[in-house]
Amino acid sequence: MEIPEKLKLEYLLALDTHIETVGKENKEGTMKRIFEITREIADLGFGEKDIHEIAKDEDLYVRYETWRKSKNI
């Protein structure tokens, strides 16, 4: 079983948004979203190692950029 692509893309988007966000209150909101997605992934039975692999997957980043552009995000 693999983490659903949609969750992987949402996780990367949440990370990007957090990095780009300015201000403590805004950072708290983006961090909350990262935790929500992490919880969804964990609820599917995946662990910390699986979540770390998302950020290391270069092919996923290519698909992420294409997805982000197609969604105008």
Predicted features and spans:
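Short intrinsically disordered terminal tails
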Residues: 1-2, 66-73
